């Protein structure tokens, strides 16, 4: 399907087929090869979506049952399963009219995440913060009707997103990894900066995540890889979704742990023997950070603010003795250049909380000899708190040249 995925190790495969990953083409390959079975859990979302079609054609799907895959992929079935297990999830409804959408929003409040089934133009998903924004999005970008319902979900702000990658056998978790996003929930998992092992989650939160994950694995009788995404705030844990396949973070956590998750998963799916992980293998003295690579600088007038749609064009994974070292390594690997002290750093922050959050960083940079610039409100705040700051107008095409600004820090509001 994607030749680049095997460009460096093409000789590892017995046979390569460069064709579209469609149901018809997969059946053609199956007719030719006559395999013992097929694995659909290591190729992303597209092969996962073929599981039930292959099952109806009596093609043996190795690992987790296609019926279980369908229970996880079908939003209504999965939500009903979570309710049955007593597992919390963000409130959501599938709605067929603007009036119904407004009625649901009246119960849960703004903001809400809107997923249209039929897109007229623009993005497939959008976070709406008020009624005007909601109406404009549904009228301009999507169609709402009985034929084309929209899914509207409660959008939780200032909430941590946590990932649970694991391998299970007959519903029992064999090995797992808990990672956390640096950014708050609302940034696509393909764009978010991932930290493993998780550094800033409560012990009680981690314990609840493990308990919920085991419940889901048992209910779906998972045999193979899976990934569950969680929202967590103040020890309240909600499940976003469960994918019964290897996620994009699978190779990353395997690298950090030095434990090959996908090898274990493959052996389980093939009913082959595998090595049980030692508990000490998960007690590691290193931190991994997976950071995304973006191409905004090459796209004129591209909006660099991240959201629910994926924007990254690549990623890097780095390891350090602690979080700060691993994060710095990852930033440098994505092309970030650390400014020298003789250069200027500029801050632009709207919300008071953001100004307070950057106070320690600005003091440290000032102590290191950096010249501090800021927009009017931010400059007044920093000066009032002992950080000598020069106020400048922004945006200004000449500001970076005249003031020698080599690094701009800005914290846009979610609506910008």
Predicted regions and their residues:
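Generic long, charged, amphipathic alpha-helical segments
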Residues: 1, 11, 347-348, 354-359, ...
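A general structural motif
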Residues: 18-23, 70-74, 323-329, 349-353, ...
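A conserved helix-loop-beta module that forms one wall/lid of the active-site cleft
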Residues: 64-125, 384-393
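Conserved small/polar residues in nucleotide/adenosyl-binding loops
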Residues: 409-416
């Amino acid at each position: 399907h994607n030749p680049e995925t095997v460009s460096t190790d093409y000789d590892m495969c017995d046979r390569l087929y460069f064709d579209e990953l469609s149901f018809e083409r997969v059946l053609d390959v199956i007719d030719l090869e006559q395999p013992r079975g097929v694995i659909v859990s290591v190729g992303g979302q597209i092969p996962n979506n073929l599981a039930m079609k292959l099952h109806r054609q009596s093609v043996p799907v190795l690992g987790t049952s296609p019926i279980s895959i369908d229970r996880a992929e079908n939003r209504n079935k999965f939500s009903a399963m979570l309710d049955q297990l007593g597992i919390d999830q963000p409130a959501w409804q599938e709605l067929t009219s603007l009036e119904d959408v407004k009625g649901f929003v009246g119960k849960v409040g703004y903001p809400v995440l809107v997923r249209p089934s039929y897109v007229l133009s623009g993005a497939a998903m959008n976070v709406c913060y008020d009624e005007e924004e909601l109406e404009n999005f549904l009228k301009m970008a999507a169609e709402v009707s009985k034929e084309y319902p929209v899914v509207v979900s409660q959008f939780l702000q200032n909430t941590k997103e946590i990932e649970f990658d694991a391998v299970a056998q007959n519903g029992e978790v064999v090995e797992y990894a808990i990672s956390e996003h640096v950014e708050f929930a609302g940034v696509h998992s393909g764009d978010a900066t991932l930290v493993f092992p998780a550094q800033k989650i409560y012990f009680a939160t981690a314990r609840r995540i493990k308990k919920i994950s085991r419940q889901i694995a048992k209910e779906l009788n998972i045999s193979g890889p899976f990934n569950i995404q969680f929202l967590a705030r103040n020890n309240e844990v909600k499940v976003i979704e469960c994918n019964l396949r290897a996620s994009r973070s699978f190779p990353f956590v395997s690298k950090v742990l030095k434990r090959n998750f996908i090898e274990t998963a493959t052996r389980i799916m093939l009913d082959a023997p595998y090595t049980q992980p030692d508990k000490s293998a998960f007690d590691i003295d290193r931190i991994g950070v997976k950071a995304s690579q973006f191409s905004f600088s090459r796209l004129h007038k591209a909006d660099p603010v991240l959201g629910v749609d994926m924007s990254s064009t690549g990623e890097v994974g780095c390891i350090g003795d602690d979080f700060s070292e691993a994060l710095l390594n990852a930033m440098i690997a994505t092309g970030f250049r650390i400014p020298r002290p003789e250069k200027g750093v500029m801050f632009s922050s709207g919300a008071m909380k953001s100004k307070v959050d950057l106070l320690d960083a600005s003091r440290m940079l000032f102590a290191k000899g950096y010249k501090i610039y800021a927009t009017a409100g931010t400059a007044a705040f920093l000066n009032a708190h002992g950080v000598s700051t020069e106020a400048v107008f922004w945006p200004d095409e000449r500001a970076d040249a005249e003031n020698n600004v080599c690094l701009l820090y800005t914290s846009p509001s979610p609506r910008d």
